[in-house]
Amino acid sequence: MNSNELDLRNKYFYEIFGKKRKSDTSTPTQLFSGSKVQTNINEISITNDEDEDSTEDENKASLKDYTLGHDTGARYRIAPDCSSHQLKASPVLHISTNLNSSPQSFTGDQISPTNKKISINDSTRQDKGNSCTTTSSPSQKRSNVLLPHVRKHSSPSLLSFSKNSGSHMGDPNQLSTPPTPKSAGHTMELHSSFNGKHSSSSTSSLFALESLKTQNRRSSNSSNHSSQYRRHTNQHQRHHSRSKSSPVSLTEISMIKGTPLVYPALLSLIAIKFKQTIKLSTHKKMGLLYRDSFTGKQAIDTLCLIIGSLDRNLGMLIGKSLEAQKLFHDVLYDHGVRDSVLEIYELSSESIFMAHQSQSSTSIANTFSSSSSSVNSLRTKTEIYGVFVPLTHCYSSTCSLEKLCYSISCPNRLQQQANLHLKLGGGLKRNISLALDKEDDERISWTNSVPKSVWESLSKQQIKRQEAIYELFTTEKKFVKSLEIIRDTFMKKLLETNIIPSDVRINFVKHVFAHINEIYSVNREFLKALAQRQSLSPICPGIADIFLQYLPFFDPFLSYIASRPYAKYLIETQRSVNPNFARFDDEVSNSSLRHGIDSFLSQGVSRPGRYSLLVREIIHFSDPVTDKDDLQMLMKVQDLLKDLMKRIDRASGAAQDRYDVKVLKQKILFKNEYVNLGLNNEKRKIKHEGLLSRKDVNKTDASFSGDIQFYLLDNMLLFLKSKAVNKWHQHTVFQRPIPLPLLFICPAEDMPPIKRYVTENPNCSAGVLLPQYQTSNPKNAIVFAYYGTKQQYQVTLYAPQPAGLQTLIEKVKQEQKRLLDETKHITFKQMVGQFFHSYINTNRVNDVLICHAGKILLVATNMGLFVLNYATSINQKPVHLLHKISISQISVLEEYKVMILLIDKKLYGCPLDVIDDAENADFLFRKNSKVLFKYVAMFKDGFCNGKRIIMIAHHFLHAVQLLIVNPLIFDFNSGNFKKNLKAGLVDFSVDSEPLSFSFLENKICIGCKKNIKILNVPEVCDKNGFKMRELLNLHDNKVLANMYKETFKVVSMFPIKNSTFACFPELCFFLNKQGKREETKGCFHWEGEPEQFACSYPYIVAINSNFIEIRHIENGELVRCVLGNKIRMLKSYAKKILYCYEDPQGFEIIELLNF
């Protein structure tokens, strides 16, 4: 085998994985000096730097130019007239890309200015000599060897692009890559030996070649070839084997074995896998945040992973092919793909949805993991076509490395010629006419626009200042020209033709080109002012005053940038459903304009950021003395631009959030009960999203990510399941959405007992629980629990990676903490500790009351009345005041100094001063109290229309009595007591059992089991003036009609401004004065089954047995849930609620909830 020819092919078409054996001699390594990179991807050539002392002989191996690419495929040119002597010398690789006249290396290696050459023959002879004395063991030979899977074949044509691929070529800078790992296809150092020393020997190259030959075989005819493949495979597996406790991720497997994720020659497959694998996140460029974007380095990393190669330049070539077919683009449409963390790119809008589906769980999956199962549920249609020839297999079924293939375009041809010791030759000549047109609008600098005599006398700093000012002028001129193109080319043509259907044409133009005319009006005048200043003198004194004049009129940029997400959505929607529009956009892109609609519209997004950068440049090169006045104004301009950019960030961020929520709203389908997610709220945001699996991921395919897509909103957690129906993907709700205040999660397969946690931590909130017994989580399981509702459930899901699982947990913690911080003004205060026990002494708390300006607390229990005086001492125990059995309710009329108690279905009235004498309280109560009413089920006192009224409900005949309070009633020792009591009494009858009384401004609502009655209270106390009617109109609304199918358990009414807020066990809503539901304010459903209600504006509170539900009364948002065990509300005030709960020992703790 001709080792020189073989080494030439190795260096260009193969990557050499691993290091040389210890048997190889260690000689200093010299870099190939002939690497030349120019910037046109259509012309790639391999040439040999001729040695000055070399002479031509008769046996020269002429390497003809050849081109076999389709359309604008890249070409490899081997320099002609290469003698055999020159071939024996180390050939130097030249890569010519003709995008720029200045040479530039693909890698970051330092190239010697002199063309140093390495004689591979000499180094090989040295290795052979040294290998006789030093022999390495098999383990040493295998150490650190990475066997490649992707073959770097020699091919007449590097790329076979689809149409129009040649019009999207990049900047030369985009081809620069880090110096390591070295790419064998381009400038490459010889690999170091195992002992860390450098060597120029080709032994490691031959070893890697043998690995490539075994893995890239095309025929199974050779048993020797198969045995080599098995030998190297076994060695590789032994070397890279790992324990089960340390699983290898998909990324590690691909990069170690060089295993491509798809067939790397088909660009369509690479495009689909790229969409599924690329990690989308938020990046910032020129002061603006770009969501769902990625860096150039991430793109090349992902492409190298997909094709299973460490050659970043190879990834660059594939990236250019994909970018040329509009798979992704620079966010500013300024240049092509570059291998840099500073350059930001985004997928085409039609690809974003698929990318979200497959890798929106980047927090769940590894950075480059993809879901094989989700591919079945995702659309695999792609508009990317083409074949990457160097990575293709030969189409001949009989092709092998042992004989020369009959096909001249066989990718294995060069290696076959090397194996058979054939001379290089043949091929097609390069077609110069296929070279790209280099017509580029070169930017004219300020020094070229003015005579040399003008700037010769200026300092270097002043020249740079004038250059910055002139750049501001030229870029503004270009921007205004783009606006004119938008107005005259796009808007006018779309309005005057039938490209867009007539029914949506006006709306499309209105939203896509929103605020373009306002921006054009302002910037045209701004440009005129700049042009006038430039024309006054070749040396511009300054432009700060012009900026200060026009900056207040730059507000249309805010509205324009905020409208971009929706405009982009409309454009991509029309492209997908309207072939006429897609054709029009493609024609514009391929015309002299060279950009599509979206590219032109994006210039308005980046323009404010460019202003900030240019002004900063001008300030940097301004002289503090000579440019003092202009510099001071420029500092003001910079502050104003910073403020503008902050406002733009807020506006664009809010618009993007709103757009994301709208897209989510459109694709949600509720299979069973509809749940209001609050997506119509303008402040709703998607905080996190990803994929989880219903199955153990470790038992499935290594690339499996999940089949359940979750969305963490700022108010709840949503689970969706994708299903294909008639080529459309429906996203049905997998489980009922869980509000964050009721969401418990645990990183394990089993949830610890939540009830025990709530009982031991009273007044707690939902959150993350630690596993009870499990110390590790090898399956990456996570349990979600919906707590305390009629729809409560638990579901266990699995995450592909522990890092993603931890990210989800942290995001949930952040959102739940944010909700608590927003309601930190809601506080708790313990009024009575462990004193009342309902099981041991049957001393159940029935009612409480605060009187004497909050100094006295009265507690009514089954064993009597207790009093707690906070003014005398702290932490004292309640005093048993009255020894009466079963005191149900208590109320105090402080203006009359009377206490009213409901004891064993009898309503008593007694003087309030009995609470001051605890020792004689029983005697005073028997002596001075009077029975007001008998057979009383409940009572309530309050004010209505300026009168103090007591409402009494009886057990028999659904009777209701109204007592108008006056001082004569409570003269218990008077002989006219009963007469005075009867004088203020009004009797009513309702058709069902009364449940509650609600005092409104001049009405009293009586909530009954079957309906709601409203009682008008006249200003003048006339028994005939009290009128009762039914409040709700059954036939007015379907919601109300459905409510009457069942009897009510509890009903409460609260006056809110000019409306009435009605609360029922299922839902709540606003009523107007006519008793009709206010449709504009919505209808809110409770999470639980409330037993009591309270109102503390702007909050409405529903009391359940195991949690307190606090909602915003205007929009129904669930702001907080207070968890507990056996919760009961005792009394409610305007800004306070007294309630009790049961602690782990069974004591009833009385708490005060302050708003």
From Swiss-Prot:
Protein's UniProt name: RHO1 GDP-GTP exchange protein 1
Limits of the CNH domain: 842-1137
A single GO molecular function term of this UniProt record: guanyl-nucleotide exchange factor activity
Superkingdom assignment: Eukaryota
Keywords of this entry: Acetylation, Guanine-nucleotide releasing factor, Phosphoprotein
N-acetylmethionine, modified sites: M1
Polar residues bias spans: 100-143
Comp. bias regions, Low complexity: 155-167, 190-227
Cellular component, GO annotation: cell division site; cell periphery; cytoplasm
Function: Stimulates the exchange of RHO1 GDP-bound form into GTP-bound form.
Domain DH: start-end pairs: 464-651
Phosphoserine found at: S154, S155, S433
Composition bias, Basic residues: 228-243
